[in-house]
């Protein structure tokens, strides 16, 4: 490793850059720079309808952070085409959007510190903008690939969806995945469960905007499924490891699936063993989001505290214990962060 003091300075600078990238996303400054035109701070502020003094100081951070280029001869700023594609809504993946996680997680730092001292957890309602940030992330990773890449991982599933089956999404959040499936497969019926009233309300509104007539969103604790519900397909996108009682939830899912049904689970692509994650390209980030959200929201409900980094080995073990005798694990080239489990 390089000199540790230099490493720490680099960490501090990159943490600051991450915050400014988030600000650049939320203020749409990067979108204003997407065409790579050189602008003064006054021109950029006017184009973005923002306060020039704040824009100028933000530019100071992203120039010294080697994000934005600066020409001192005419005091203009520009974003290269390569960087514009990775930092704006017009690109294939918006890293600036993902930086919102840093401030969203830091919001509960005081409560997390108390948990270190006294135990317990931080409840969902303590988080600021969490569902919004999660929806943004899902819109980049899950939604663009859902119909053409993720669903076809299951043999004959797309054909069955076209004909008409019953689908349940566990921990549906803001309903992005379910609403997209409902829009593409109008002959199938889609139900979404989440215990967040705010998320269910948002999902319902979005469904109405899309004109979906085949969706039902319900505020439901997935530890307690309605006894009479049976589904051909159950999905869970980045949801199982947050549960207070994940083993019970998996048991309920198995019971709710028809004999010829499928459980499709997307979850973090990691090992259950720390030593195997030391070279994971997002290891520090994923353990951090687990500690500051996934694990603690479970512990807040007196839960198991499984955490985001429960790993493939533990996931397969728990799926087997829930009664899924066949578990196939897939990865997609566009998504190095997640595993896709096909269980029956």
Regions found by a protein language model. Give the residues of each.
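Short amphipathic alpha-helical interface segments
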Residues: 21-39
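Conserved Class I S-adenosyl-L-methionine-dependent methyltransferase catalytic core
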Residues: 10-15, 23-24, 32, 61-165
């Amino acid at each position: 490793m390089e000199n540790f003091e230099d490493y720490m300075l680099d960490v501090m600078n990159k943490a600051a850059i991450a915050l400014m990238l988030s600000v650049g996303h939320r203020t749409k400054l990067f979108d204003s720079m997407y065409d790579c035109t050189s602008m003064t701070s006054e021109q950029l502020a006017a184009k973005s309808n923002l306060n020039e003094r704040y824009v100028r100081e933000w530019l100071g951070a992203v120039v010294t952070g080697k994000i934005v280029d600066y020409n001192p001869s005419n005091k203009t700023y520009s974003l290269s085409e390569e960087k514009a594609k990775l930092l704006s809504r017009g690109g294939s993946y918006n890293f600036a959007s993902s930086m919102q996680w840093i401030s969203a997680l830091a919001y509960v730092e005081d409560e997390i510190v108390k948990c270190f001292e006294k135990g317990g957890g931080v409840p969902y309602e303590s988080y600021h903008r969490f569902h919004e940030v999660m929806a943004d992330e899902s819109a980049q990773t899950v939604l663009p690939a859902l119909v053409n890449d993720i669903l076809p991982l299951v043999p004959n599933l797309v054909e069955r969806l076209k004909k008409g089956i019953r689908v349940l999404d566990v921990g549906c959040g803001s309903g992005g995945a379910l609403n997209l499936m409902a829009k593409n497969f109008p002959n199938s019926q889609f139900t979404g469960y989440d215990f967040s009233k705010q998320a269910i309300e948002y999902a319902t509104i979005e469904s109405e905007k899309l004109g979906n007539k085949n969706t039902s969103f319900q505020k439901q604790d997935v530890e307690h499924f309605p006894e009479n519900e049976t589904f051909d397909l159950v999905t869970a996108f980045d949801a199982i490891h947050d549960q207070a009682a994940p083993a019970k939830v998996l048991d309920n899912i198995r019971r709710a699936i028809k004999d010829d049904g499928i459980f499709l689970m997307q979850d973090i692509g990691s090992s259950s063993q720390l030593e195997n994650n030391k070279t994971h390209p997002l290891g520090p980030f994923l353990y951090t989001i687990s500690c500051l959200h996934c694990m603690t929201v479970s512990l807040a409900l007196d839960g198991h505290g499984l955490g985001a980094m429960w790993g493939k080995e533990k996931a397969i073990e728990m799926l087997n214990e829930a009664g899924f005798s066949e578990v196939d694990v897939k990865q997609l080239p566009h998504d190095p962060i997640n595993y896709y489990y096909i269980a029956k």
